[in-house]
From Swiss-Prot:
Similarity remark: Belongs to the complex I subunit 1 family.
Job of this protein: NDH-1 shuttles electrons from NADH, via FMN and iron-sulfur (Fe-S) centers, to quinones in the respiratory chain. The immediate electron acceptor for the enzyme in this species is believed to be ubiquinone. Couples the redox reaction to proton translocation (for every two electrons transferred, four hydrogen ions are translocated across the cytoplasmic membrane), and thus conserves the redox energy in a proton gradient. This subunit may bind ubiquinone.
Species this protein is from: Allorhizobium ampelinum (strain ATCC BAA-846 / DSM 112012 / S4) (Agrobacterium vitis (strain S4))
The protein's assembly and partners: NDH-1 is composed of 14 different subunits. Subunits NuoA, H, J, K, L, M, N constitute the membrane sector of the complex.
Membrane topology summary: Multi-pass membrane protein
Transmembrane segments: 14-34, 82-102, 115-135, 161-181, 198-218, 258-278, 285-305, 321-341
Main location: membrane
InterPro entries xrefs: NADH_UbQ_OxRdtase_su1/FPO, NADH_UbQ_OxRdtase_su1_CS
Catalysed reactions, semicolon-separated: a quinone + NADH + 5 H(+)(in) = a quinol + NAD(+) + 4 H(+)(out)
Record's subcellular location: Cell inner membrane
Name this protein carries in UniProt: NADH-quinone oxidoreductase subunit H
Length: 347
């Protein structure tokens, strides 16, 4: 009995506890990221933004949560009720499940699997199913058109993201996310006489791929200027037009969980994860989790600024950018990086 408890029960209890702790921290972080998104937009438009609920509006997201929860969910008359209610649950579950393999610091990961980046890519590809289910089950033309746009958009830009990840894997030599971060301890900066610095991170040596990944992440998460699935001027609110109350809140939660995931993934692949920008004692004293959060927040700030200042693309422009610009460019970069690594004897 003791061996059964120590072998199965205790490890399972630890994993459940870690998952719940990560979930609570992630939800609180998303609440404040949502507030930051609104504040950035307000600052660009010379407004104050949310500033009533709590000091400086810090509790605005929690007030919105209560508002959504206590509203009555309304299901359209011709909708498929089961699929209509299941769609937001699928979207938010898949968005949160991806975080199981994201390392926040050295050893701070629930499942440190050797194919972590492949798991993230596979699960994030499934998130479009929640949107398609919601658009189809609403029995309305605007949600259905928004769902079709979302499917085409996500498929188009996942190809470019896949090639970007391949170039990072060629440089890191591993599919494990922790190993990818640790591989950025040496690189271009080490050759220039600045070992373990921000010049070693992949953002510099793979700068074109960093730009492609950032723009593709905007399209993958339906962020402006690529928010075609929910374009207000054309599709009212896209696939969410028939949703309200808690289901709408769950769609929004899944969307922002995916956005924060892309920020974390950008940090891991290109910005050195939890590594400090310089190998000096003062910066090494700062816990790695702090560096990780600061870098992910910086990437989200770039997301927010892009949303506020860049106008929306037309649908044909979006598709042309993905298939005629990013796809050939990312494929060419894979070949170039592989050739350079082989030529330099690093492969």
């Amino acid at each position: 009995m003791d061996s059964f408890v120590s072998t199965y029960v205790w490890p399972a209890a630890i994993m459940i506890g870690q998952s719940l702790l990560l979930l609570v921290c992630l939800l609180v972080f998303i609440a404040y990221i949502l507030l930051a998104d609104r504040k950035i937009w307000a600052a660009v438009q010379l407004r104050r933004g949310p500033n009533v609920v709590g000091p400086w509006g810090l509790f605005q997201s929690f007030a919105d949560l209560l508002k959504f929860v206590f509203k009555e969910p309304i299901i359209p008359a011709g909708a498929n009720k089961a699929v209509f209610l299941l769609a937001p649950l699928v979207a938010v579950t898949l968005a949160l499940a991806t975080w199981a393999v994201i390392p926040l610091n050295q050893g701070w990961v629930i499942a440190n699997i050797n194919v972590g980046i492949l798991y993230v890519f596979a699960i994030s590809s499934l998130e479009v199913y929640g949107i398609i289910m919601g658009g189809w089950a609403s029995n309305s033309k605007y949600p259905f058109l928004g769902a079709l746009r979302s499917a085409a958009q996500m498929v188009s830009y996942e190809v470019s993201i896949g090639f970007v990840i391949v170039t990072v894997l060629l440089c890191a030599g591993s599919l494990n996310l922790t190993d990818i971060v640790n591989s950025q301890n040496h690189g271009l900066g080490t050759m220039m006489g600045m070992p373990a610095s921000l010049l070693d991170w992949h953002w510099l040596s793979l700068f074109p791929m960093f730009v492609i990944f950032f723009i593709s992440a905007l399209a993958e998460t339906n962020r402006p200027p690529f928010d075609l699935p929910e374009a207000e001027s054309e599709l009212v609110a896209g696939f969410m037009v028939e949703y309200g109350s808690t289901p709408y809140m769950m769609f929004m939660l899944g969307e922002y969980a995916a956005i924060v995931l892309m920020c974390a993934l950008t940090t891991i692949l290109f910005l050195g994860g939890w590594l400090p920008p310089l190998d000096i004692a003062v910066l090494n004293w700062v816990p790695g989790i702090i560096w990780f959060i600061l870098k992910a927040t910086l990437v989200f700030f770039m997301f927010g600024i892009t949303k506020a200042i860049v106008p929306r693309y037309r649908y044909d422009q979006l598709m042309r950018l993905g298939w005629k610009v990013f796809l050939p460019l990312s494929l060419a970069m894979v070949v170039i990086v592989a050739f350079v690594l082989k030529l330099g004897g690093w492969a």
